[in-house]
């Protein structure tokens, strides 16, 4: 199976990318950020990717890592996350792609808390979408603009 962005050719849904601190900023650097972008562009279409500024190794932390999500300091976490929220909103993207669970939870939370108009989606959800398969639990991360994408639904297939 090969990924492709045909599902988004006419939709032109726009995506931005959250670079996880543990993997990019404090880990493997821009090389892995470039790998992430290569995959994302294959999956959603290069013309549908809007970069945050700054990005890659210089991207802002979302504020959800290092156990901060579970620390009990919700107000402080959200206040710190406002920088990331503003950065995402500035792109005008419909979705923020996250490759890290902590980032996903934080970006999703600050979006709802501050009234953002973007959805948060895991990278693997988009990979499944581009392959034409999507598990039942993955559809909950899609906004209304992607709920009707024609994909194979394994839970309803007849064997």
Tell where the protein language model's regions lie, with residue ranges.
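Iron-sulfur cluster-binding electron-transfer modules in prokaryotic oxidoreductases
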Residues: 1-159
